[in-house]
From Swiss-Prot:
The keyword Cell division does not apply. Keywords: Cytoplasm, Lyase, Tricarboxylic acid cycle. Belongs to the class-II fumarase/aspartase family. Fumarase subfamily. This is Fumarate hydratase class II. One of its GO terms (biological process) is malate metabolic process. It catalyses: (S)-malate = fumarate + H2O. One of its GO terms (molecular function) is fumarate hydratase activity. Its EC number is 4.2.1.2. Homotetramer. The active site is at H188, S318. There are 2 substrate-binding sites: the catalytic A site, and the non-catalytic B site that may play a role in the transfer of substrate or product between the active site and the solvent. Alternatively, the B site may bind allosteric effectors. It is found in: Cytoplasm.
Length: 463
């Protein structure tokens, strides 16, 4: 039988496994919210550790917290930050919308670990109390939003942006490598005028570059922190200067540019910054969906598709068709993008649900945001390393497409006019002949003139 100890809260005593650091409120949450399997994301757990350490440092500096207690809280919080106590954060996402249970989970774990460090009895709340000491100058209403912003900003900066830059570099390299390969363009999925394969991939690279810039542009607002607003934004029970000092400490711990939010009422009641940054991520997902689709369609075949690109062959593609290989990286990436689109709908709705002085959809916002960041970052690296870098052009097929395209007739607009050119193209399409055969045979111009005007390499730039 598992050994237990007694923990207490305002509802009375409750048994907790003796080897677990959490206390009564986390234990009650385990019983009250048996919903799903989605645990509180580890980046949020780390961020709660950062908040508790920063708050202890600020309270110590302001003379509110005994130095010995503060030092021990900081030591225990560091273990949370380092991931050493992850097993002691068992709560699911689906809990109170303020994140109170997860905040108390952090308070209790740090309290009991600090008590253990000081040689005390876990569950006694002495000499380190989860509310009076670990949660000093704080409310769940400002602590969880602060942790949410820290977690999301850290993941964007350290995981998402580097992954997107990795993809951008690979796409830009292909654009430079293929700058002289002329291919036929397509609009409305139909043949259009020529461009180079490098220009096409240069467009993809620019989409990702723009996406990176959009995300970076949103970060200053995401890095504004609610801490110091306490229950409703007034800062009740937080000493003067606490908000500014705790933000400074958080910036120091993370190495990121966190600041105190200029208006704590907005910071508690609305999470527009979360919606805004995720909107930029959603836009990147839209870009990635387009790029992944183009690449898999251009690589369709190998015998009966467009066949302009040869995609890396990573694994067998069919359990029934021998030799079949599929564009699996594009398929994985587009599924990720679909998930991000759904997450953005959730975040948009949740962000609108600030009722009076508090938004109570915090955990689901954090969960969906962090899932999007993790998925896009991982998928961008996978798509780059397992697809983009190994793509090769099928030059013969590309050349054949250019030679057979009727849209080269556009080069004759200036000499023959739109109507005559349209007639040449339609006749060639109807008869299964070439533009040259119809233009020269129909007496529109000589063979030499056709050679002079219809030059694909002259059709890939203005003029």
């Amino acid at each position: 039988m598992t050994a237990t100890r007694i923990e207490t809260d305002t509802f009375g005593p409750i048994e907790v496994a003796a080897d677990r650091y959490w206390g009564a409120q986390a234990q009650r949450s385990l019983g009250n919210f048996k919903i799903g399997w989605e645990k509180q994301p580890l980046p949020v757990v780390r961020a709660l550790g950062i908040v508790k350490r920063a708050a202890a440092e600020a309270n110590l500096a302001l003379g509110k917290l005994d130095p010995k207690i503060a030092e021990t809280i900081i030591a225990a919080a560091n273990e949370v930050i380092e991931g050493k106590l992850n097993d002691h954060f068992p709560l699911v996402v689906w809990q109170t919308g303020s994140g109170t249970q997860s905040n108390m989970n952090a308070n209790e774990v740090i309290s009991n670990r600090a008590i253990e460090m000081l040689g005390g009895e876990m569950g006694s709340k002495k000499p380190v109390h989860p509310n009076d000491h670990v949660n000093m100058s704080q409310s769940s209403n400002d602590t969880f939003p602060t942790a949410m912003h820290i977690a999301c900003a850290e993941q964007v900066v350290h995981d998402l942006l580097p992954a997107l830059k990795h993809l951008h570099k690979a796409l830009a390299a292909k654009a430079a490598e293929w700058k002289d390969i002329i291919k036929i363009g397509r609009t409305h999925t139909q043949d259009a005028t020529p461009l180079t394969l490098g220009q096409e991939f240069g467009g993809y690279a620019q989409q990702i570059e723009n996406g990176i810039a959009r995300i970076e542009m949103t970060l200053p607002m995401l890095m504004q922190l609610a801490q110091g607003g306490t229950a409703v934004g007034t800062g009740l029970n937080a000493p003067v200067g606490f908000a500014e000092l705790v933000a400074e400490q958080i910036a120091g711990i993370t190495g990121l540019g966190f600041t105190t939010a200029p208006n704590k009422f907005e910071a508690l009641a609305a999470h527009d910054a979360m919606v805004f940054t995720h909107g930029a991520i959603n836009t990147v997902a839209a870009s990635l969906f387009k790029i992944a689709n183009d690449i898999r369609f251009l690589g369709s075949g190998p015998r009966a598709g467009l066949g302009e690109l040869s995609l890396p062959e990573n694994e067998p593609g069919s359990s029934i068709m021998p030799g079949k290989v599929n564009p699996t990286q594009s398929e994985a990436l587009t599924q990720v993008c679909a998930q991000v689109f759904g997450n953005h709908s959730t975040l948009t709705f949740a962000g609108s649900q600030g009722h009076f002085e508090l938004n109570v959809f915090n955990p689901v916002m954090a969960y969906n945001f962090l899932q999007s960041v993790r998925l896009v970052a991982d998928a961008a690296i996978s798509f780059t390393d397992n697809c983009v870098v190994g793509i090769e052009p099928r030059v013969d097929n590309i050349k054949k497409g250019v030679e057979n395209s009727l849209m080269l007739v556009t080069a004759l607009n200036g000499k023959l006019g739109y109507d005559a050119c349209a007639k040449i193209a339609k006749t060639a399409h109807k008869n299964g002949t070439t533009l040259r055969e119809e233009a020269v045979g129909g007496g529109y111009l000589t063979n030499e003139e056709f050679e002079q005007y219809v030059r694909p390499e002259k059709m890939i730039s203005p003029g």
